[in-house]
Amino acid sequence: GIKEMLCNMACAQTVCKKSGGPLCDTCQAACKALG
């Protein structure tokens, strides 16, 4: 849903940009849980 999309964008601009890897995956997995 839209929440998941916005959450993924936030992940991409923060966690994924800074470190990536497992932390990025975890962030996006949390987004998926939001649906």
From Swiss-Prot:
Annotated disulfide bonds:
C7-C31, C11-C27, C16-C24
Protein keywords: Amidation, Antimicrobial, Disulfide bond, Oxidation, Secreted
GO biological-process terms attached to the record: cytolysis in another organism; defense response to Gram-negative bacterium; defense response to Gram-positive bacterium
Task of the protein: Has antimicrobial activity against Gram-positive bacteria (C.glutamicum ATCC 13032 (MIC=1.6 uM) and B.subtilis ATCC 23857 (MIC=1.6 uM)) and Gram-negative bacteria (E.coli ATCC 25922 (MIC=12.5 uM) and P.aeruginosa ATCC 27853 (MIC=25.0 uM)). Displays very low activity against the Gram-positive bacteria S.aureus ATCC 9144 (MIC>100 uM).
| Domain of life the protein comes from | Eukaryota
Which named protein is this?
Answer: Turgencin-B
- Methionine sulfoxide is found on M5, M9
Record organism: Synoicum turgens (Colonial ascidian)
* Broad class of the protein's primary localization: secreted
Q: How is it modified after translation?
A: Oxidation likely reduces antimicrobial activity against Gram-positive bacteria and Gram-negative bacteria.
Q: Which residues carry this modification: Glycine amide?
A: G35
